[in-house]
């Protein structure tokens, strides 16, 4: 069941759900608008000939209040907000419709698991032939929260727990890679 603004407000007030910093206008009827942070990562194409699922990917770290996303390019960003989900709440990130209509696709590659705590890393893709200028602090995506039928037996304890700033892929830390080394 997707949570309403009333439930979201009550959970924040009770301390069950943490979204900080948060302004009242960010809470929508069935979601929370999240803002763009000032931490960005782009893949360093000069240090790698090819990316694999087995090796750490090299990134260029960019800290700034404004960034230009070139045409047909990919960039990692972060939300300004730090979130903490309880063990019975999961979430997913959707790009704002107004921004999607500009050709900027925003996602986070799946669900935000119950028990997750940290800033959310966003994957941005500019599908245009024109660059798009983005400013930190602008509402960029929506966090949709859903209550699970039961509390998770094992809340999220993965490799992105407590992340701050944009965090690159840690696919090289996957279980499959560890098993192949043994």
Curated annotation (Swiss-Prot):
InterPro entries: dCTP_deaminase, dUTPase-like_sf, dUTPase_trimeric
Entry annotated with the keyword Oxidoreductase: no
GO biological process: dUMP biosynthetic process; dUTP biosynthetic process; nucleobase-containing small molecule interconversion
Enzyme kind, highest EC tier: hydrolase
Reaction catalyzed: dCTP + 2 H2O = dUMP + NH4(+) + diphosphate
Key words of the record: Hydrolase, Nucleotide metabolism, Nucleotide-binding
Binding site for dCTP: 96-101, 113, 121-123, 142, 156, 163
CDD domains found in the cross-reference section: trimeric_dUTPase
PANTHER family assigned to the protein according to its UniProt record, in alphabetical order: DCTP DEAMINASE
Function text: Bifunctional enzyme that catalyzes both the deamination of dCTP to dUTP and the hydrolysis of dUTP to dUMP without releasing the toxic dUTP intermediate.
Protein name, per record: dCTP deaminase, dUMP-forming
Gene this protein is translated from: dcd
């Amino acid at each position: 069941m997707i949570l309403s603004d009333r439930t979201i407000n009550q959970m924040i007030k009770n301390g069950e759900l943490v979204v900080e910093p948060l302004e009242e206008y960010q809470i929508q009827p069935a979601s929370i608008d999240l803002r763009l942070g000032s931490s960005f990562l782009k893949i360093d194409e000069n240090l790698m000939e090819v990316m694999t699922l087995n090796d750490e990917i090299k990134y260029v770290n960019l800290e700034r209040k404004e960034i230009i996303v070139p045409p047909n390019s990919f960039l990692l960003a972060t939300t300004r907000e730090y979130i903490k989900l309880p063990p019975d709440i999961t979430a997913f990130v959707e790009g704002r419709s107004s921004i999607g209509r500009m050709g900027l696709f925003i996602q986070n590659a799946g669900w935000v698991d119950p028990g997750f705590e940290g800033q959310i890393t966003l994957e941005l893709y500019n599908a245009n032939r024109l660059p798009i200028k983005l400013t930190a602090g602008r509402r960029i995506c929506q966090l949709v929260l859903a209550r699970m039928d039961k509390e998770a037996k094992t809340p999220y304890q993965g490799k992105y727990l407590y992340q701050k700033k944009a965090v690159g892929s840690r696919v090289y830390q996957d279980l499959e890679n560890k098993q192949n080394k043994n």
